[in-house]
Amino acid sequence: MNMYCTLDTETVGGASNPLGFYHLGGIIHNRLGEVVGCFNYIIAEMLPYVLNDDYAKKNLPLYYEMLREGTATLIDTQAHAIEVVNSTLEFYNVGIMTAYNSGFDYCKTMCAELLEGREFIDLWLMALECICQKASYKKFCAESGRTNGKGGCKTNAESVFAYLIGNPTYCEEHTALEDSKIELEIFNACIKSHKKFTPNCHCWDFEGKFGLFPKLPLDK
């Protein structure tokens, strides 16, 4: 049976053309969401860039704590981290990669190598198809202020997970392994919905994507 890997990266250098990832985390699981392993790597070669990035360096205390407590491993380079992760994926027979906005993690970073010979699911597109069309999701976004300023609901992982747990004030940690955990919960909710979803397609490549972005209810 094919196993899955839900993965997240934290990067520096902007979303359009990032310099690379400084934190790589992921969870190995089956289609039922049963977890068999995880990884949590901090990349030494990228730390100087983190120190010069006002956004990224806010979480430096968390990374130092992870390293002190042994909950994360320091790896020298991105390339070495990809090599180690690939070996882990092969060990667990992972055939399907997932990420929230896979078009970023698997197209803008070295994680693209992890898709070689594997299928993928963009959890953003999956959530749009399985969760964000619900009237209750639109109502939640309207009442919690999770809007995009253009008459639409936010559909990022933080907003979708906040809806799933019924916590309008939930804030994503923005560290790779912790964010992978909430993305796995989104995957689980989508699978349990038994709704059709589109595999092997990044959200921004999906032809009907703009019709999927939910609008706020008129009676908000």
What do the PLM-derived regions correspond to, one by one?
Residues 51, 55-60, 64-65, 128-180:
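Active-site-proximal helix-loop-helix substrate-binding element of RNase H-like nuclease domains
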Residues 2-108, 112-113, 158:
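Conserved non-catalytic scaffold segment of RNase H-like nuclease domains
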Residues 102-106, 126, 176:
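Short, solvent-exposed loop/turn segments at secondary-structure junctions
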Residues 14-16, 128, 185:
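Conserved protein kinase catalytic core
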Residues 116-132:
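Conserved beta-strand -> loop -> alpha-helix junction used to position metal-binding or nucleic-acid-contacting
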Residues 164, 177-220:
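Acidic two-metal-ion nuclease catalytic site recognized across multiple nuclease folds
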Residues 9-12, 123, 183:
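Ser/Thr-centric signal marking residues that sit
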